[in-house]
Amino acid sequence: MNLIPTVIEQTNRGERAYDIYSRLLKDRIIMLGSAIDDNVANSIVSQLLFLESQDPDKDIHLYINSPGGSITAGMAIYDTMQFIKPQVSTICIGMAASMGAFLLAAGEKGKRYALPNSEVMIHQPLGGAQGQATEIEIAAKRILFLREKLNQILADRTGQPLEVLQRDTDRDNFMTAEKALEYGLIDKIFTNR
């Protein structure tokens, strides 16, 4: 069951009810609180574009609590974050794993945060293939290409050498907020506002 809270706001015209996500969007806050698939990515991209159209000079805040998900869907969010004019700050609440960690690191440098008990996990892309040998070979080449591409972007975003990223993403690599800060995935740990 997916319950979405509703909030009531008093205005000079009376009361207005919002679902919580729409109300947060008014404050330029976007929640990524699920696995990343095409539907989630389309929703996040749409919100980023909408907020840019509202005010291209005001920051957008992307809160992340995600186990990761589709690389192509995540790259749509990443590319949009880099494309739009407003700076996007990222805040890890709970867990930013896999593509969630990638998007956390994709925030504006100096504006990537985590709460103290958050966890971040990086690893190499996951995939599978079936079919004829040539189809399996094509899929394997693609996933190796994606691994190198993601590692290079993470190296650029964190300041870590590419060789370190290749080693550290070989297996699931879980980090506390403190370790993510040392690693360069985030810039600060928030303890209060």
Swiss-Prot record:
Keyword Protease: yes
Catalytic activity, EC: 3.4.21.92
Active site: S98 (nucleophile), H123
Catalytic activity: Hydrolysis of proteins to small peptides in the presence of ATP and magnesium. alpha-casein is the usual test substrate. In the absence of ATP, only oligopeptides shorter than five residues are hydrolyzed (such as succinyl-Leu-Tyr-|-NHMec, and Leu-Tyr-Leu-|-Tyr-Trp, in which cleavage of the -Tyr-|-Leu- and -Tyr-|-Trp bonds also occurs)
Pfam families linked: CLP_protease
GO MF annotation list: ATP-dependent peptidase activity; ATPase binding; serine-type endopeptidase activity
Coiled coil: none
UniProt entry tagged with the keyword Cytoplasm: yes
Record-level GO BP terms: protein quality control for misfolded or incompletely synthesized proteins
Alphabetical list of Gene3D superfamilies matching this protein: 2-enoyl-CoA Hydratase, Chain A, domain 1
Subunit composition and interactions: Fourteen ClpP subunits assemble into 2 heptameric rings which stack back to back to give a disk-like structure with a central cavity, resembling the structure of eukaryotic proteasomes.
Official protein name in the record: ATP-dependent Clp protease proteolytic subunit 2
Biological source species: Bacillus cereus (strain ATCC 10987 / NRS 248)
Originating gene: clpP2
